Curated annotation (Swiss-Prot):
Organism: Trichodesmium erythraeum (strain IMS101)
PANTHER family assigned to the protein according to its UniProt record, in alphabetical order: MITOCHONDRIAL RIBOSOME PROTEIN L39/PROLYL-TRNA LIGASE FAMILY MEMBER (PTHR42753), PROLINE--TRNA LIGASE (PTHR42753:SF2)
Function: Catalyzes the attachment of proline to tRNA(Pro) in a two-step reaction: proline is first activated by ATP to form Pro-AMP and then transferred to the acceptor end of tRNA(Pro). As ProRS can inadvertently accommodate and process non-cognate amino acids such as alanine and cysteine, to avoid such errors it has two additional distinct editing activities against alanine. One activity is designated as 'pretransfer' editing and involves the tRNA(Pro)-independent hydrolysis of activated Ala-AMP.
Keyword field contains ATP-binding: yes
PROSITE patterns, alphabetized: AA_TRNA_LIGASE_II
Protein name (record): Proline--tRNA ligase
Gene3D superfamilies: Anticodon-binding domain, Bira Bifunctional Protein, Domain 2
Documented EC number(s): 6.1.1.15
Subcellular location: Cytoplasm
InterPro entries: aa-tRNA-synt_IIb (IPR002314), aa-tRNA-synth_II (IPR006195), aa-tRNA-synth_II/BPL/LPL (IPR045864), Anticodon-bd (IPR004154), Anticodon-bd_dom_sf (IPR036621), Pro-tRNA-ligase_IIa (IPR002316), Pro-tRNA-synth_IIa_bac-type (IPR004500), Pro-tRNA-Synthase_IIa_type1 (IPR023717)
Entry keyword annotation includes Aminoacyl-tRNA synthetase: yes
Keyword entries, A-Z: Aminoacyl-tRNA synthetase, ATP-binding, Cytoplasm, Ligase, Nucleotide-binding, Protein biosynthesis
Annotated GO CC locations: cytosol
Reactions performed catalytically: tRNA(Pro) + L-proline + ATP = L-prolyl-tRNA(Pro) + AMP + diphosphate
Gene that encodes the chain: proS
Length: 601
């Protein structure tokens, strides 16, 4: 391709709407254009990157025996209602674009395809002899993001590889899961990215085992906790750890003390001369289920710890059946306005005790009449602790479970792990933190969808049983931008060789110099014929403009047919290091072959 023929416009200034470096650079370098909020066009350079990432993904998937297919983007609402996810995706998370056709039928634009693939399996798979089977697709997906941002990182449409496997037993499912773990690691290594595989929450997808693949980058939306020994890594939503040890309690006897102006843990510790580890704090949440019922949740947790909202949401989702519901639509700490709708009297905020009376809740069909009380494991074994008294300006000290307060029946792990905590696998190790961009996620779904949708097969014993499932996703367009977020400098993008739109750019400093044009043209032909993706900058522009654009666009290697031609040489500049060397024209092909082969190892 000749740049003089390509649709390419580069910008010198950062676009106003872009927040992170990769977003700014992809727009400035002419890779993408914003069409609407969270909607982008992939211009020729970007599509080449997408295609190269897709090729790597396909090769690794095919190597595992997975088969490529293409599933419909429009999905009937009935399928999602069967699985029980329609309300979750159109109301709770609200990320599915839904529409009504001219026959008054509800449809959704697919953010994911578990329901569709399960329906296909239900219709086609009859016997254990057909198992295991693994299908995947590369396709545009849609999400009605509340706040689209960061370009391709969080758009309303995106390109994704999603795969789904079906199995007769757990052993087979685990083998495919392990195969996908290996395949995903290979995809990211081959793409030239630094990454971590981390334990993750299954979220609305569901299932048991779940792992995310994070590209490490300072602008990553996700926080990762890991140990230096490489034996543990998890995202913040899923991470577990051992908190610091409890300090000896300074409270010998039970008492109620006046503690004015101590609504926070910090002020309480200062007033009572105690450690936050000696306190049981009680955090009030309001959960709204999909049947409209609100449940007031009181979480008792050690004073130096925070509640992990995702872990709490998972606990409440598991309890949905107790309230004749299927899922949680919303979870929040109720503000003053929310409290007015259900509070029978003013709450003693900042001084709430574990036994806050149920008579604080107004009688209503839409509100559960009793607090749902749960205690985090960090608070269970505290003795002689301090806590609220349910009276403003007063706290209880020297309290114990089973004496002054009944221990809640629901003992849970809802604490948020944090940097500096001790590792569970080795308490001598502490958790470190890093930022990451999620580009892949694999799940062991089990029978969640097959049971809900009646997808069964006949096993070796002649019994009809639900199919076991796994699902595996890679954000192709997100991975491409994540590569930029991980590798750039003040001059522009530094593409990994494997996914760069072109390996080489040949710059002609003076298009009026016939020797420069001739040598550049011959090299352009020779390199492309040898399988080296090469683009020729033959534009009628100043040399400085061409060099700046080459750095901005991020092509790994630049050949300049400049003054050194007088001695039969050209300049070779490596984008990642800016190192420049002069090589004779006859050695350009062999030199570049060696450099590219080395980079791809």
């Amino acid at each position: 391709m000749r740049l003089s023929q390509m649709l390419l416009v580069t910008l010198r200034d950062d676009p106003a709407e872009a927040e992170i470096p990769s977003h700014k650079l992809l727009i400035r370098a002419g890779y993408i254009r914003r069409i609407g909020n969270g909607i982008y066009a992939y211009l020729p350079l970007m599509l080449r990157v997408i295609n190269k990432v897709s090729t790597i993904v396909r090769e690794e998937m095919n190597a595992t025996g997975a088969q490529e297919c293409l599933l419909p983007q429009l999905q009937p609402a009935e399928l999602w209602q069967e699985s029980g996810r329609w309300d979750t995706y159109t109301q709770a998370e609200g990320i599915m674009f839904s529409l009504i056709d001219r026959q008054n039928r509800e449809l959704g634009l697919g953010p994911t395809h578990e329901e569709v693939i399960t329906t296909i399996a239900k219709d086609i798979i009859r016997s254990y002899r057909q198992l295991p089977i693994h299908l995947y697709q590369l396709q545009t997906k849609f999400r009605d993001e509340i706040r689209p941002r960061f370009g391709l990182m969080r758009g309303r449409e995106f390109i994704m590889k999603d795969g789904y496997s079906f199995h007769a037993d757990e052993e087979s499912l685990k083998k495919t899961y392990q195969d996908m773990d290996k395949a995903y690691r290979n995809m990211l290594r081959r793409s030239g990215l630094q990454f971590r595989a981390v334990d993750a929450d299954s979220g609305a997808i569901g299932g048991s085992a779940s792992q995310e693949f994070m590209v490490l980058a300072d602008a990553g939306e996700d926080e990762i906790l890991y140990t230096q020994d490489g034996k543990y890594a998890a995202n913040m939503e899923k991470a577990i750890s051992l908190p610091v040890d409890v300090e000896a309690s300074p409270f010998d006897t039970y008492d109620k003390l006046e503690t004015p102006g101590t609504e926070t843990i910090e002020k309480m510790c200062e007033f009572l001369h105690c450690s936050a580890t000696n306190i049981v704090k009680n955090v009030l949440y309001q959960a709204v289920y999909d049947n409209g019922i609100s449940v007031l949740v009181l979480v008792s947790i050690r004073g130096d710890q925070d509640v992990n909202d995702v872990k709490l949401l998972n606990e409440l989702t598991r309890l949905a059946g107790n309230y004749e519901a299927k899922t949680v639509l919303a979870l929040s700490v109720p503000d003053v306005e929310a409290q007015k709708k259900w509070a029978a009297k003013s709450l003693p905020l900042g001084y709430i005790a574990p036994d806050l009376s149920d008579d604080y809740i107004t009688s209503s069909k839409q509100v559960s009449p009793k607090f749902l009380r749960m205690v985090d494991k960090t608070a269970v074994y505290l003795t002689n602790f301090a806590t609220g008294s349910n009276e403003l300006g007063n706290h209880i000290v020297g309290a114990n479970w089973g004496q002054e307060f009944a221990l809640p029946k629901l003992v849970v792990d809802v604490r948020k792990a944090k940097k500096g905590d001790r590792a569970v696998h080795d308490p001598s190790k502490t958790l470190e933190t890093a930022r990451g961009i999620e580009v892949g996620h694999i799940f062991q779904l089990g029978t969640k969808y097959s049971e809900a949708m009646g997808a069964t097969y006949t096993n070796e014993q002649g019994q009809e049983v639900p199919l076991l499932m796994g699902c595996y996703g890679v954000g192709v367009s997100r991975l491409a931008q994540a590569a930029v977020e991980q590798s750039y400098d003040k001059d522009g993008i530094i593409w990994p060789v494997a996914i760069a739109p072109y390996h080489v750019v040949i710059c002609i400093p003076n298009i009026k110099d016939t020797q420069q044009i001739e040598v550049a043209g011959n090299l352009y032909k020779e390199l492309n014929e040898a399988g080296i993706d090469t683009i020729l900058d033959d534009r009628d522009e100043r040399a400085g403009v061409k060099f700046k654009d080459a750095d901005l666009i991020g092509i790994p290697y630049r050949i300049v047919t400049g003054r050194s031609l007088k001695s039969g040489k050209v300049e070779l500049i490596e984008r990642s290091t800016h190192q420049c060397q002069e090589i004779v024209v006859a050695q350009v092909l062999s030199t570049l072959k060696d450099l590219i082969e080395k980079a791809l190892k």
